[in-house]
Amino acid sequence: MVRLVITYDIRKDKIRNKLFRLLERYGAWKQYSVFELEINPVHKVELFHSIADLIEDTDRVRIYDLCERCQGKITELGEVSPDKMQVVI
């Protein structure tokens, strides 16, 4: 498995929403325009192609591949991540 952090800056709402839904299928929404994913290498390649097909030249997507050692050094400060919020009905 590979752990990725993906950030994006997408101008058009329609494309940004599509990218959000795509990334949501693969991982956890952490902050506005930031996702963490843990996927296998085959899905990683598929995801990269899907992102490239979706975005426009003016859009930006950054992908950080986290090594095992780096994963243990993640620090979270402030509000709880959206994926850790609990919904009470």
Swiss-Prot record:
Its cofactor is Mg(2+). GO terms for molecular function: metal ion binding; RNA endonuclease activity. Mg(2+) binds at residue 9. GO terms for biological process: defense response to virus; maintenance of CRISPR repeat elements. The keyword tRNA-binding does not apply. The keyword Magnesium applies. InterPro entries: CRISPR_associated_Cas2, Virulence_VapD/CRISPR_Cas2. Keywords: Antiviral defense, Endonuclease, Hydrolase, Magnesium, Metal-binding, Nuclease. It is an enzyme of class 3 (hydrolase). It holds the Pfam family CRISPR_Cas2. Its EC number is 3.1.-.-. Belongs to the CRISPR-associated endoribonuclease Cas2 protein family. Homodimer, forms a heterotetramer with a Cas1 homodimer. CRISPR (clustered regularly interspaced short palindromic repeat), is an adaptive immune system that provides protection against mobile genetic elements (viruses, transposable elements and conjugative plasmids). CRISPR clusters contain sequences complementary to antecedent mobile elements and target invading nucleic acids. CRISPR clusters are transcribed and processed into CRISPR RNA (crRNA). Functions as a ssRNA-specific endoribonuclease. Involved in the integration of spacer DNA into the CRISPR cassette. This is CRISPR-associated endoribonuclease Cas2 2. The lineage of its organism: Archaea, Methanobacteriati, Methanobacteriota, Stenosarchaea group, Methanomicrobia.
